[in-house]
Amino acid sequence: MLQWMRTYNETAPEGEDLNFYGMDMQWADSSKEYVFDILEQAVPGAASEYEEALAFLNDDDMYDISTETFAQGMPVAEKLIQEVDNAEAVIVEAFGSETFAFARECARSIYNCCDIRKSDSEYNEIRDGHMAEKVEWFLEHGDG
């Protein structure tokens, strides 16, 4: 399929090329980096509290983190989402509405990561539910 997509894209009309979207909510480093960067630029100093509180949530140690620690990260991630929401006007003015939407979704992905990883026996069900939400988000915010 990938080869077919590459071949198709070589001759596809402008704007009709095929691509993939993705945002991995089972890992956190990329989402943290993006949302912290945008938040810090929009509201200097605002990201530091969350960088510290969510430092445990890193891709290198993901399999060594306890379910209890993930559960404790969920309220912090909820607060981060609220912080991004509170900075919406500043982020939109500085970077645009799509940057705000993506930063907010990165914050949600951090929450989802904690939720999925703390779920143990319900891992697949929780993950699949969040994946369905992510598909809906991309349908709303993507280019096709």
State what each model feature region is:
Residues 1-144:
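Structured catalytic-domain cores with a bias toward divalent-metal coordination
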